């Protein structure tokens, strides 16, 4: 694999940052704990933010973008643990948020070219559906040529009924260095408060398996070939 500086982005140097936007009222505690533990072990600076609102959320991301140059940030992952969607807007803490606001807050000159991912987990109902998630994670975490990443795609439910479609976020407009994915549930029989969201729990499990023995980049290339979640 070529290591041309013009072709590949070096994610082995600098600070990697993970934001987790959560809340105290709904069923995100298990996922919140798992994400925090996993990404700290993977060498990320993790910040869990609860019960925020739209203005505070965008301000937090904007302020982070301003300090990113000083911290030499080389990768940013943002998880939103949400309890629902209304008119395409995702609940982030206590407010509904158009995801474009969050993308725009990080699409700054300082962070331009730095790989960024926005992942939305919705626990209104229980079902995990994904598209191209394995490929994106593998490439995102393995210094792959950004130009070869697939076009941004969003998860969709096959033949969704109106009740399911109601919970689908409006896809944000994202630049080439920004990747967006979402997952949600449609089965209330699972207690996600106790067991967590399958997508997040499985992803973090794969990240942790050999984390103390090898680099995350190499780990994911090997493990994610078997990554699959039944709806």
Curated annotation (Swiss-Prot):
Task: Output the superkingdom of the source species.
Answer: Viruses
Q: Name one Pfam family in it.
A: Peptidase_C14
InterPro entries, alphabetized:
Caspase-like_dom_sf (IPR029030), Pept_C14 (IPR002398), Pept_C14_caspase (IPR011600), Pept_C14_p20 (IPR001309)
Membrane-crossing residue ranges in chain numbering: none
Molecular function (Gene Ontology), one example? cysteine-type endopeptidase activity
An example Gene Ontology biological process: positive regulation of neuron apoptotic process
User: Could you say which protein family the record assigns here?
Assistant: Belongs to the peptidase C14A family.
Return the protein name. Caspase-like protein
């Amino acid at each position: 694999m070529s290591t041309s500086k013009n072709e590949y982005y070096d994610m082995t140097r600098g600070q990697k940052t993970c934001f987790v936007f959560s809340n105290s009222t709904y069923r995100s505690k298990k996922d919140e704990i798992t994400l925090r533990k996993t990404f700290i072990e993977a060498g990320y600076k993790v910040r869990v933010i609860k019960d925020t609102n739209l203005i505070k959320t965008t301000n937090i991301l904007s302020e982070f973008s301003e300090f990113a140059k000083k911290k030499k940030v080389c990768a940013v992952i943002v998880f939103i643990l949400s309890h629902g969607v209304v008119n395409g807007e995702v609940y982030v803490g206590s407010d509904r948020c158009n995801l474009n606001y969050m993308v725009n807050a990080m699409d700054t000159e300082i962070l331009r070219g730095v790989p960024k991912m926005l992942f939305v987990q919705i626990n209104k109902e229980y079902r995990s559906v994904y598209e191209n998630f394995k490929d994106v994670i593998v490439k995102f975490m393995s210094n792959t040529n950004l130009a070869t990443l697939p076009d941004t795609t969003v998860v969709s439910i096959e033949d969704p009924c109106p009740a399911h479609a109601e919970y689908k976020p409006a896809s944000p407009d994202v630049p080439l260095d920004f990747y967006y994915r979402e997952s949600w549930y449609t089965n209330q029989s699972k207690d996600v408060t106790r067991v967590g969201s399958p997508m997040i729990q499985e992803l973090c499990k794969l990240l942790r398996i050999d984390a103390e023995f090898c680099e995350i980049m190499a780990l994911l290339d090997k493990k994610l070939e078997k990554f699959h979640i039944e709806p």
